[in-house]
UniProtKB/Swiss-Prot annotation:
Protein name as annotated: Probable dual-specificity RNA methyltransferase RlmN
Other observations noted: Reaction proceeds by a ping-pong mechanism involving intermediate methylation of a conserved cysteine residue.
Location within or outside the cell: Cytoplasm
Annotated EC: 2.1.1.192
Keyword Disulfide bond part of the UniProt annotation: yes
Any one annotated GO CC term: cytoplasm
Domain Radical SAM core: 105-341
Record-level Gene Ontology MF annotations: 4 iron, 4 sulfur cluster binding; metal ion binding; rRNA (adenine(2503)-C2-)-methyltransferase activity; rRNA binding; tRNA (adenine(37)-C2)-methyltransferase activity; tRNA binding
Organism of provenance: Chlorobium phaeobacteroides (strain DSM 266 / SMG 266 / 2430)
A Pfam family reported for this protein in Swiss-Prot or TrEMBL: RlmN_N
Residues binding [4Fe-4S] cluster: C119, C123, C126
Cofactor(s) listed in the protein's UniProt record: [4Fe-4S] cluster
PANTHER family: 23S RRNA METHYLTRANSFERASE, RADICAL SAM CORE DOMAIN-CONTAINING PROTEIN
Gene this chain is encoded by: rlmN
Similarity comment: Belongs to the radical SAM superfamily. RlmN family.
Length: 363
């Protein structure tokens, strides 16, 4: 049985540089090949016409260029509605599956992408953590989610493409920092075709303090969102087990340093859960926590998940909570839920699908 060749896309830039050197080629070839893969999206080495035939043959002898398989596609609402949420289930090289979501609106096309297969953090209100953790995604597996969504957009909106990216899919992005960073650098590279400004990219974390510090020093110009969900240490630990390792006091100090360093506000994401974090006292604690650094608050509703007993709050409770924050002079928004009917909303991604797999040409 013939051994399957390695997927060249899985190599980091440093690993690709070393592979090219091992072939006896000059370093500048690395950039050329990388551009063919991630800017021109070459499917074969034969397409790389600016590279010698000899090198193309060498590459073809050692590597292949692989793509994720579209295993399922679900749309929230009518297939003819250009603004309905879409969820893609992608099958990776090792047969693991991830989900990525397109959230269209009149002014933007947002890609919600995953950073890991599953999630190790097991947040109590999130389906991704209940599936278990398999592995980190490579940089190309992150990038290919964006490209897959872009391909889908072109079947519905000929002149549109992804305008924003949020790392709010499966996994904790800051636990996969190197691959996260490389994927962002590729997607924002001004010499590549996609070329999305980093300010259009948001990284969401539950508050991994070493990762926040690393992000602050990385030179990336992305936005940062913190999945806070409670400003009570006890309540937060009951919802987010890893919060026991990173106290709210530590997190507040880290975010104060981060915003001072970057000059940019962070977004505090707060999912309202009936009877758990929705009281006047909870609102007071949230206001107190947010006064220490530059931030805005984004409230979201709970999206139902099978086998979880949480419930969304009543509108009256939500209005009271919002008013308390506004009275304190703090900017607050309420995020509209997208894709709940296809389990594509916040906290619902669990890499489940039903449709037969097909190749990328059918995206």
């Amino acid at each position: 049985m013939q051994t399957r060749l390695s997927n060249i896309k899985h190599l980091s830039r440093q690993e690709l540089r070393q592979a090219i050197a091992n072939l006896g080629e000059p370093a500048y070839r690395t950039r050329q090949i990388h551009q063919w893969i991630f800017s021109h999206r070459a499917a074969t080495f034969e397409e790389m016409t600016t590279i010698s035939l000899e090198l193309r043959n060498k590459l073809a002898d050692q590597f292949r260029i692989g793509f994720p398989i579209l295993a399922d596609c679900q749309q929230d609402g009518s297939a003819n509605d250009p603004f309905s949420t879409v969820k893609l289930l992608l099958e990776l090289d090792d047969n693991e599956k991830i989900e990525t979501v397109l959230i269209p609106s009149e002014n933007r096309m947002t890609a919600c992408v995953s950073s890991q297969v599953g999630c190790p953090l097991q947040c109590r209100f999130c389906a991704s953590g209940q599936t278990g953790f398999k592995r980190n995604l490579s940089a190309d597996e992150i990038i290919d989610q964006v490209f897959s969504l872009n391909d889908f957009i072109r079947t519905k909106h000929e002149s549109n493409e992804i305008t924003n990216i949020v790392f709010m899919g499966m996994g904790e992005p800051l636990l996969n920092f190197e691959n996260l960073k490389e994927s962002i650098e590729v997607l924002s590279d001004q010499s590549y075709k996609f070329n999305l400004p980093q300010r259009k990219i948001t990284i969401s974390t539950v508050g991994i303090i070493p990762g926040i510090n690393e992000l602050g020093k990385s030179g990336l110009k992305t936005k940062l969102a913190i999945s806070l969900h409670s400003a009570s240490q006890e309540t937060r630990e009951s919802l987010i087990p890893v919060a026991s390792e990173f106290s709210l006091t530590q997190l507040r100090k880290t975010l104060s340093e981060y915003t001072s360093q970057t000059g940019e506000p962070v977004t505090l994401v707060y999912m309202l859960l009936k009877g758990i974090n929705d009281s006047v006292e909870d609102a007071r604690l949230l206001v107190k926590f947010s006064r220490s650094f530059l931030c805005k608050i984004n409230l979201i509703d709970y999206n139902s998940i099978i086998n979880m007993k949480f419930k969304p709050v009543f509108n009256e409770t939500k209005d009271m909570f919002i008013q308390h924050i506004l009275d304190a002079g703090i900017h607050v928004t309420v995020r509209k839920s997208h894709g709940a009917s296809i389990n594509a909303a916040c906290g619902q991604l669990a890499a489940k699908g039903t449709q037969k797999a097909e190749n990328r040409n059918n995206l």
